Amino acid sequence: MLVNNGGGLPQGDTDNPELIAQPRGGTPAVIDTREGLEKASRALAQGSTPIALDVERAQGFRYGSDPYLVQIRREDVGSFLIDTHALPDLSVLQPGVEDVWLLHDCLQDLPNLRQVGLRPSALFDTEIAARLVGLERFGLAAVAEQVLGLGLVKDHQASDWSVRPLPKEWLRYAALDVELLTELYYRLSKRLDQMGRWEWAQQEFAHALSVEPPTAKPDRWRSLPGAGKIRSRRGLGVLKALWETRESIARRIDMSPGRLVRNAALVRAASNPPPNKRALMSINEFRSPIARQYEDEWMRALASVAALTEDELPPKRKPVQPGSIPEPRQWVRIDEASAARLGIVRSAVASVAASVGLAPEVVLAPQVQRYLAWAPLDPSRPSGDEVEERMVTRGARDWQIDLTLDPVCDALGV
């Protein structure tokens, strides 16, 4: 299907998307000075169109998920590429971005944008919108193909954006990431309105703005691939100590922990705890040029575990957090009645989802479905009250409750 795009974009074809190779107006120069930032602020403040934003990080290379480049575009002003390593405080831009923000998968980027001093006043997320109109592929490039008939090359998504200077080809890619967001906003907004789902989208955007960044889970070392095969408490103690040491070193040298020592090496060491330095160095990853610099710290970690009594070692099973719900695959073993209820809830939600042409997880999040099913309902309470209360407690939006409350209650017989 041919698509007559606006904003100076070429005509698209959803059956044969045209690849967008260059940003309109060319690739902007990187802003890395205070003077350049203030100039950008004045320019953005003159615009009246929505604000398209994106963030590039260096995950897998640096420790954590700090932003290294922020891209901003207003159709009536142009695009800006801002080096947030050189300019970690972008709050001077705030007066010029007091309009609706356009993001794709906003939960990835909002924490970084807040980190650099920017706060949204309103939001439109093109990924959320794509899900609500029934698209089955949600990546930015896929949405652009399906809605605009235009293609984007996603070849630097996992690059090390902390390198300086940034290659010109990477900057072109970064500018293209905000090139199509405004046209997507116009077209997806129209579809949402035509389908009677604009209010659904507004509720989703408001919810996204209210989401707090996730806190680090306790005992993250237990989630390493292969950790479940370690049977001894001593081995688990070694895994915990090496993981914590790796975190400490990686944070100190600003390196992704997996680049310092791979997860598999930690698990291997914990499966057969090395009694001495020679045994530890027999594991290839620990004698790499980087990891070997910290051999004394690795050995201190091992020695600290060797000095622990059995009672001081980690338990074989991860401690259950109060109020936590087990993984669904464990339900049949733990509580067959809860497993049966989950099947009923899932079936009811899937039926509703099919009737409106959406994925079940869009109609009601899996964690909400699990919360509905895990504990028995109180038979003394009025029909449906407890189900609705549980939905609200777990963050279901009004439109989701309106769609699913009665079908779920009917399925559960309440």
Write out the residue ranges for each language-model feature:
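N-terminal accessory regions of nucleic-acid-interacting proteins
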Residues: 1-51, 55
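Accessory DNA-binding and partner-docking regions appended to nucleic-acid-acting proteins
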Residues: 5, 168, 188-414
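Active-site-proximal helix-loop-helix substrate-binding element of RNase H-like nuclease domains
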Residues: 10-16, 20-30, 71-95, 99-182, ...
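Conserved phosphate-coordination/catalytic loops
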Residues: 31-35, 175, 260, 363
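A structured, charge-rich N-terminal accessory region that forms the first stable segment of a protein
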Residues: 59-62
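An anion-binding catalytic pocket shared by soluble metabolic enzymes
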Residues: 66-69
